[in-house]
Amino acid sequence: MKRILTLMAVLSLLASCGTDKKTNNPENMNKNEALQEVAGRKNFGPNHALVTTPQPCVMIATWDENKNPDVMMAAWAGQYDARQIVISLSKHKTTDNLEKTKAFTVSFADERTVAESDYFGLVSGNNVPNKVARAGFTITPSPNVNAPIINEYPLTLECKVVSWSDGILVGEVVNMSADDCILDDDGHIDLGKLKPIVFDAAAMAYRSVGEIVGKAWGAGKAFTE
C-alpha cells in the first residue's frame, strides 16, 4: 500500500511538471477533458466526496496542553498497514495536541452517540476546551498511550503517532479495547451490537451500518464451481 501511494505521488508530480500554461488554462482543460455521457447513468463529474461514500465516523481524542480531553470527528480514515491507520486531517486543535503528545485514541461513533459525535465535529477545542464534559461524556486515561479514552464509545484504538505531515496522520495501533456490551458469546467484537454510523456525503447525513448480508470469502464461491 505504501509503495502504491508513493508511486501515485511521483506520477502526480511528474504530470504537474510536464504541464504548460496552455494546459493549465481552465478553459483549455474543460475543452480537452470534456466528459462523455455513460449510457443509462448520470454523470457527476470528478466529485470524489461522493465516490468514497459512505465514510467512517472516527472520533479522535487527545490531551491538550492543560490535560483537558479533546475529541473531534473525522471521516477520511482507513487501514494503512497491519497495525497502522491513516487519517487525512487539516489543522485542528487535535493536530496541535498530537504534535505535542505523540499519541491519540480513535473510537467509532454509533447510533447511541450521534448527537454528541456530531457536536464534537461542530465545536473546536480552541473555543470550547471543556466540550467533552459539556456533552456529558467521561474519560479514562489510556494506560498504554498518552491520550484519553472516551468511555461512552465502546470500541477504541490506542495509537502512537508514526508520522504527521502534509495533512496525513499515520498512527500505530498499540491496543484495541472493547466494552463488554459489544462482545458476542465467544468474546469477539460484534458490529451488530456496536451499530456504528457512517457519513453519507451525498445526503449529508449519518447512516447506521446494517445487518450481515453475506460471508466474506464465501458468498461468491458459487461462481467458482
Language-model regions, residue ranges each:
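Short, linear, compositionally biased motifs with a strong N-terminal bias
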Residues: V10-L11
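Basic, polyanion-binding surface patches
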Residues: N24-E225
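Bacterial lipoprotein signal-peptidase II cleavage site
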Residues: G18-N24
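C-terminal motif of bacterial Sec signal peptides marking the signal peptidase cleavage site
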Residues: L14-S16
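Sec-dependent signal peptide recognition
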Residues: K2-L7
